[in-house]
């Protein structure tokens, strides 16, 4: 997927996550925190490709990561998301206040990139270092891909006008509870590690 596609897809995912109330924090969150945060991180997984939008601007980071992991390796995995969150919680000074909705927006932007790359034939190694590729190849990579734009805009339009009265037993409500539980457990784990 192109940088433009990732930007559009991250905005669409942010709108969907907020309107679907994917987590309680996102449901109550501020649009001006969630959407810019998602945009900020939506290109980050491609830091492993020196010719990517970020790779060209941050060659001093991109080249070593590309040598170590290759393109669509570690940075396109759930382990990378966990590692970045753990690093954030352990290394960011407590005096730095980042709203919870902005942090979830950043995670959402990163995950939107991985999800978008799953729509290409190459897929992504979600369970890296396991080499299995997860894919739903509906996008064929080509410059100026109109299908890419169409899918992003369709998701955006649906997210804006989706029904807000979803049944309590729907998949969205279930996933919201699961994400909230995982977030609480992650916070407890990090807090426990910091105390010892």
From Swiss-Prot:
Localization, UniProt: Cell inner membrane
UniProt keyword list = Cell inner membrane, Cell membrane, Membrane, Transmembrane, Transmembrane helix
**Topology versus the membrane, per the UniProt entry?**
Multi-pass membrane protein
Entry's Gene Ontology cellular component terms: plasma membrane
> What is the induction comment?
Repressed by LexA, induced by DNA damage; it has 2 LexA binding sites both of which bind LexA with high affinity in a cooperative manner.
Q: Which residues lie on this side of the membrane: Periplasmic?
A: 1-23, 99-106, 171-196
Give me the segments passing through the membrane.
24-44, 78-98, 107-127, 150-170
Keyword presence, Transmembrane:
yes
Q: Which Pfam families match?
A: YdjM
Assign the protein's first listed, main location to one coarse class: membrane
Q: Which GO terms describe its biological process?
A: DNA damage response
Question: Which residues does the entry place in the Cytoplasmic compartment?
Answer: 45-77, 128-149
Which family does the similarity line name?
A: To B.subtilis YvsG.
Q: What is this protein called?
A: Inner membrane protein YdjM
Naturally occurring in which organism (per UniProt)? Escherichia coli (strain K12)
